[in-house]
Amino acid sequence: MLFRSKGVLPWSTLGVSETDGWGRRFTYRASQGVNSNFADGADGTGASCNIAAGVSFQLCSSANLNVLATSGGSNVATSVPAVVLSHGKNGLGAYPGGGGNAIGTASGDEGENGDDDNIFVSKDHSANFDDQVVWLSPNILFNRMVAAGKLP
Protein backbone atom coordinates (compact mmCIF):
# COMPACT_ATOMS: atom_id res chain seq x y z
CA MET A 1 0.00 0.00 0.00
CA LEU A 2 1.31 3.46 -0.90
CA PHE A 3 1.02 6.28 1.63
CA ARG A 4 1.53 9.87 0.54
CA SER A 5 2.32 12.78 2.80
CA LYS A 6 -0.08 15.16 1.01
CA GLY A 7 -2.81 15.25 -1.57
CA VAL A 8 -6.54 14.94 -2.03
CA LEU A 9 -8.20 13.25 0.95
CA PRO A 10 -8.88 9.56 0.11
CA TRP A 11 -12.63 9.99 0.67
CA SER A 12 -13.65 6.55 -0.55
CA THR A 13 -11.21 4.74 1.75
CA LEU A 14 -12.27 6.88 4.70
CA GLY A 15 -15.99 6.63 3.91
CA VAL A 16 -16.54 10.40 3.78
CA SER A 17 -17.90 12.81 1.19
CA GLU A 18 -15.68 13.48 -1.83
CA THR A 19 -16.21 17.23 -1.65
CA ASP A 20 -16.80 20.07 0.78
CA GLY A 21 -19.87 22.32 0.78
CA TRP A 22 -18.55 24.20 -2.26
CA GLY A 23 -18.08 21.07 -4.38
CA ARG A 24 -14.29 20.94 -4.04
CA ARG A 25 -12.14 18.12 -2.76
CA PHE A 26 -10.61 18.22 0.70
CA THR A 27 -6.80 18.16 0.85
CA TYR A 28 -4.59 16.74 3.57
CA ARG A 29 -1.03 16.69 4.82
CA ALA A 30 0.45 14.00 7.08
CA SER A 31 3.69 14.26 9.03
CA GLN A 32 6.49 12.31 7.43
CA GLY A 33 7.05 10.37 10.68
CA VAL A 34 3.43 9.22 10.61
CA ASN A 35 2.88 8.19 7.01
CA SER A 36 6.13 6.26 6.57
CA ASN A 37 5.62 3.95 9.53
CA PHE A 38 3.03 1.46 8.41
CA ALA A 39 3.99 -2.19 8.36
CA ASP A 40 3.33 -4.24 5.25
CA GLY A 41 2.19 -7.36 7.06
CA ALA A 42 1.58 -9.05 10.38
CA ASP A 43 5.32 -9.59 10.87
CA GLY A 44 5.81 -5.84 11.45
CA THR A 45 8.08 -5.29 8.45
CA GLY A 46 8.04 -2.44 5.98
CA ALA A 47 8.27 0.59 8.28
CA SER A 48 11.17 2.96 8.83
CA CYS A 49 11.72 1.75 12.41
CA ASN A 50 11.45 -1.58 14.20
CA ILE A 51 7.82 -2.51 14.73
CA ALA A 52 6.78 -5.47 16.86
CA ALA A 53 5.11 -8.44 15.17
CA GLY A 54 1.36 -8.01 14.90
CA VAL A 55 1.53 -4.21 15.09
CA SER A 56 0.60 -2.47 11.84
CA PHE A 57 1.46 1.05 12.95
CA GLN A 58 4.05 2.70 15.14
CA LEU A 59 4.94 6.37 15.40
CA CYS A 60 8.72 6.34 15.09
CA SER A 61 9.28 10.07 15.34
CA SER A 62 7.47 13.17 16.50
CA ALA A 63 4.89 14.64 14.18
CA ASN A 64 6.11 17.82 12.50
CA LEU A 65 3.05 19.80 11.42
CA ASN A 66 2.15 23.03 13.21
CA VAL A 67 -1.02 25.12 13.11
CA LEU A 68 -0.68 28.87 13.71
CA ALA A 69 -3.14 31.69 14.41
CA THR A 70 -1.68 33.67 11.47
CA SER A 71 1.25 33.20 9.12
CA GLY A 72 4.28 33.67 11.38
CA GLY A 73 1.97 34.06 14.40
CA SER A 74 1.41 32.18 17.64
CA ASN A 75 0.90 28.42 17.88
CA VAL A 76 -2.60 26.98 17.89
CA ALA A 77 -1.40 23.34 17.79
CA THR A 78 2.10 21.87 17.52
CA SER A 79 3.49 18.50 16.48
CA VAL A 80 0.24 17.34 14.91
CA PRO A 81 0.28 14.13 12.82
CA ALA A 82 -2.25 15.23 10.18
CA VAL A 83 -4.17 18.24 8.86
CA VAL A 84 -7.30 18.23 6.64
CA LEU A 85 -8.36 21.34 4.71
CA SER A 86 -11.41 22.71 2.99
CA HIS A 87 -10.19 25.63 0.91
CA GLY A 88 -13.42 27.52 1.49
CA LYS A 89 -15.75 29.39 -0.81
CA ASN A 90 -12.99 30.96 -2.92
CA GLY A 91 -11.48 27.48 -3.46
CA LEU A 92 -7.93 28.75 -3.93
CA GLY A 93 -5.63 25.72 -3.68
CA ALA A 94 -8.48 23.20 -3.87
CA TYR A 95 -9.13 20.55 -6.51
CA PRO A 96 -12.54 20.45 -8.20
CA GLY A 97 -14.91 17.56 -7.53
CA GLY A 98 -14.42 14.83 -10.12
CA GLY A 99 -10.74 15.69 -10.60
CA GLY A 100 -8.66 18.29 -12.37
CA ASN A 101 -5.94 20.77 -11.53
CA ALA A 102 -5.82 22.93 -8.41
CA ILE A 103 -7.89 26.10 -8.55
CA GLY A 104 -5.61 29.15 -8.43
CA THR A 105 -3.02 30.06 -5.86
CA ALA A 106 -3.83 31.60 -2.51
CA SER A 107 -1.78 34.28 -0.76
CA GLY A 108 -1.37 35.53 2.80
CA ASP A 109 -2.68 33.23 5.52
CA GLU A 110 -4.51 31.07 2.96
CA GLY A 111 -1.25 30.76 1.04
CA GLU A 112 0.33 29.20 4.12
CA ASN A 113 -2.18 26.34 3.82
CA GLY A 114 -1.07 25.43 0.31
CA ASP A 115 2.64 26.18 0.11
CA ASP A 116 3.99 22.65 0.65
CA ASP A 117 5.54 23.21 4.05
CA ASN A 118 4.62 21.99 7.54
CA ILE A 119 2.91 25.20 8.70
CA PHE A 120 -0.86 25.79 8.49
CA VAL A 121 -3.13 28.64 9.58
CA SER A 122 -6.47 28.21 11.31
CA LYS A 123 -8.46 31.28 12.28
CA ASP A 124 -11.91 32.81 12.10
CA HIS A 125 -13.52 33.40 8.71
CA SER A 126 -12.94 36.87 7.24
CA ALA A 127 -13.02 38.65 3.88
CA ASN A 128 -9.44 37.44 3.28
CA PHE A 129 -9.59 33.99 4.86
CA ASP A 130 -12.17 31.27 4.30
CA ASP A 131 -10.14 28.06 4.68
CA GLN A 132 -11.34 25.51 7.21
CA VAL A 133 -8.52 23.60 8.88
CA VAL A 134 -8.94 20.51 11.06
CA TRP A 135 -6.04 18.67 12.65
CA LEU A 136 -5.56 15.35 14.39
CA SER A 137 -3.84 15.62 17.76
CA PRO A 138 -1.26 12.97 18.72
CA ASN A 139 -3.41 12.03 21.74
CA ILE A 140 -6.48 11.36 19.59
CA LEU A 141 -4.36 9.37 17.12
CA PHE A 142 -2.93 7.15 19.86
CA ASN A 143 -6.36 6.71 21.47
CA ARG A 144 -7.94 5.59 18.20
CA MET A 145 -5.05 3.26 17.34
CA VAL A 146 -5.24 1.58 20.76
CA ALA A 147 -9.03 1.26 20.45
CA ALA A 148 -8.59 -0.33 17.02
CA GLY A 149 -6.06 -2.83 18.40
CA LYS A 150 -3.23 -1.43 16.28
CA LEU A 151 -1.11 -0.26 19.21
CA PRO A 152 -0.36 -2.28 22.32
Which residues make up each language-model segment?
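Short, surface-exposed interaction loops/tails
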Residues: 24-25, 30-152
